Amino acid sequence: EELFESILLFVTKNGYIKLVSGAEFETGRQMIAATKLDADDEVVGVIMLSASDVLTGTKKVILLTKDGLSLGFPLSEVSELKKTSRGVKGITLEKEDTVAFATVVHPAAETFEYEGKTLNARRVRNRKRAAKGQKANLMQNTLTLE
C-alpha cells in the first residue's frame, strides 16, 4: 500500500531521470516493466518519495558519476512521467562516463552516504537539470588526533 501512495524517482546509468506515481504499479499481474530502457542502459537507483516531497519541491537531487563528477539540482526540475517512458536527461555525460549513484536530500543536509563513506552535500554545486557535472572533493573534513 505504501508503494501506491508514493512517487518513485528512477535514475539510469546513462543519465536519464523521471518521477513515476506508485499507483502505476498497481496490477493483478506478478511482473510488470517498471521503466523503458535503451539496450545499453540500466537502472542505478529507485528512490521512494512522498507526494509532499515532490509537491513542495524543496528536495535536492544529487547525481554522482563513475568519473567523479557531481551535479545537484532541485527535485522540482524532474518531470513526472508514465512508467513506460525513458525519462528526461538528468545529467550530461562525457562519452565513457555513467551515473554511479543518485540520492535525494533536504537542501539543508550537510552530508549523505555513498559506498560506506560520508560525503559533503554542500560541496555538490547546484545547477540546472541536464547540466554537466563538476569535479568536487566531496569527502567530509575529519579531524584526526595523534
Residue ranges and their predicted role:
Residues 1-146:
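C-terminal interaction appendages of subunits in large macromolecular complexes
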